[in-house]
């Protein structure tokens, strides 16, 4: 099931605040300039976050698997209290921004269309990145990083991993 919150017959922007209590939260989706703020840490096995259309998600989580999708000028600000077994997958597109910090094991980042993944403060063991079309990624990988950049995009390294594999085309940078 899902919880939908709407203002009936309203065309004027109206700020409303809603308190929700759910001990089994495993997915959050925002759109249309809405904002989701978790006041307490979300503890769950798997967590999926999807934001679009200039919406925002702000939270702290302790999860074994995190999937993040951000598009259409939306923003996400995530603190992850994971461990070396935590998997993180982030996809950003269309001028959206995902900022994430904390600790995890493996990360897969995919950015496109002028979006940003700001993950220089998320300490990973291993990471794979793919940036394209004017997007950018900042990444922190301790052991291994596979980085791919194309079409005017960039990948910035917050540290130097033990093993680095780079695939970049002209007009891009990985450094």
Language-model segment annotations:
Residues 1-52, 58-71, 77-89, 105-107, ...:
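Acidic (Asp/Glu) and glycine-rich low-complexity loops/linkers
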């Amino acid at each position: 099931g899902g919880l939908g919150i709407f203002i009936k017959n309203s065309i004027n922007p109206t700020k409303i605040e809603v308190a929700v209590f759910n001990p089994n939260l495993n997915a959050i989706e925002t759109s249309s300039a809405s904002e989701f703020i978790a006041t307490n840490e979300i503890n769950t096995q798997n967590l999926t976050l999807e934001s679009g259309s200039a919406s925002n998600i702000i939270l702290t989580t302790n999860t074994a698997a995190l999937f993040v999708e951000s598009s259409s000028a939306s923003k996400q600000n995530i603190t992850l209290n994971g461990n070396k077994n935590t998997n993180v997958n982030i996809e950003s597109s269309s001028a959206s921004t995902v900022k994430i910090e904390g600790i995890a094991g493996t990360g897969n980042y995919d950015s496109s269309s002028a979006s940003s993944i700001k993950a220089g403060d998320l300490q990973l063991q291993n990471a794979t990145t793919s940036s394209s079309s004017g997007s950018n990624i900042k990444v922190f990988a301790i052991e291994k990083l596979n980085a791919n950049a194309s079409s005017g995009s960039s990948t910035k390294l917050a540290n130097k991993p033990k093993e680095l594999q780079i695939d970049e085309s002209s007009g891009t940078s990985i450094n």
